[in-house]
Amino acid sequence: MEKKVGTDRVKRGMAQMQKGGVIMDVVNAEQAKIAEEAGAVAVMALERVPSDIRAAGGVARMADPRIVEEVMNAVSIPVMAKARIGHITEARVLEAMGVDYIDESEVLTPADDEFHLLKSDFTVPFVCGCRDIGEALRRIGEGAAMLRTKGEPGTGNIVEAVRHMRQVNGQIRQIAGMTDDELMVAAKNFGAPYELIKEIKTLGKLPVVNFAAGGVATPADAALMMELGADGVFVGSGIFKSDNPAKFASAIVQATTYYTDYELIGKLSKELGSPMKGIEMSRLNPEDRMQDRSI
């Protein structure tokens, strides 16, 4: 029997449909409904939000399928779920369950410290994290249909997401300004597929959407990432670790949409209650940096 796989065009088109929106982490049906009512374009079903994964330590794996099914049955918007880096079987299970997207995620403990999944071998589209253009293009080369900054998940600290978005966009501008005979050296230096380097020069942008993720905790954080060129925003711990999740969720959705309306963002930020408690990056041990979990 011939194996069916989704084409890049179809997968990327599905991801494009989420552009300009907010995708929220949820751990049960109740949270999923709050996210949908607030205007989220999709939800990420998982067992624990990144801040809880960070606090618990140990090995973080794919969520219990019961949780994923519960979320899928609760909402009409697309449902994503996380698989460990390189864990073929977790990804196949999620695909068989009918999730709309799989996030091959560094938030979970990698199953393979050398190889990522060959995402082009799946029908379901994948989202992956990146810190620079080399990581971005390697993931696209493997078949990712959507990218996100890695940031530093579960910290409530936006600084790493800002760094990664600026790095990727700066390197895109660098490639766009190269002459054709410089592109092969660029591919070597970035550790990226040559054909994708050429495509970036032609397009002047990535061939897939790139969302902001990792540390978004306030409406202003979401608006900042959109101003820096993000195509949308993932919010992990920032919603349901806040004092008022429903109000925070709605405010972040509106700030993402109207990210240059600073008066509105100021109003949205009033009387929200306390955001999630943040972590200063200098206080993280090297082994606790989730963003370093990939190649």
UniProtKB/Swiss-Prot annotation:
Residues the record marks as active site: 82
Catalyzed reaction equations: aldehydo-D-ribose 5-phosphate + D-glyceraldehyde 3-phosphate + L-glutamine = pyridoxal 5'-phosphate + L-glutamate + phosphate + 3 H2O + H(+)
One GO process term, biological-process aspect: pyridoxine biosynthetic process
Residues annotated as binding D-glyceraldehyde 3-phosphate: 166
Keyword Chloroplast belongs to the record: no
Residues where D-ribose 5-phosphate binds: 25, 154, 215, 236-237
Record EC number: 4.3.3.6
UniProt keywords, alphabetically: Lyase, Pyridoxal phosphate, Schiff base
Protein's UniProt keywords contain Lyase: yes
InterPro entries registered for this protein in UniProt: Aldolase_TIM, PdxS/SNZ, PdxS/SNZ_N, RibuloseP-bd_barrel
Pathway assigned in UniProt: Cofactor biosynthesis; pyridoxal 5'-phosphate biosynthesis
Pfam families named among the record's database cross-references: SOR_SNZ (PF01680)
A GO molecular-function annotation: pyridoxal 5'-phosphate synthase (glutamine hydrolysing) activity
HAMAP family membership: PdxS
Assembly and interaction partners: In the presence of PdxT, forms a dodecamer of heterodimers.
Function: Catalyzes the formation of pyridoxal 5'-phosphate from ribose 5-phosphate (RBP), glyceraldehyde 3-phosphate (G3P) and ammonia. The ammonia is provided by the PdxT subunit. Can also use ribulose 5-phosphate and dihydroxyacetone phosphate as substrates, resulting from enzyme-catalyzed isomerization of RBP and G3P, respectively.
Family membership: Belongs to the PdxS/SNZ family.
Name of protein: Pyridoxal 5'-phosphate synthase subunit PdxS
Species this chain originates from: Listeria monocytogenes serotype 4a (strain HCC23)
Organism lineage string: Bacteria, Bacillati, Bacillota, Bacilli, Bacillales
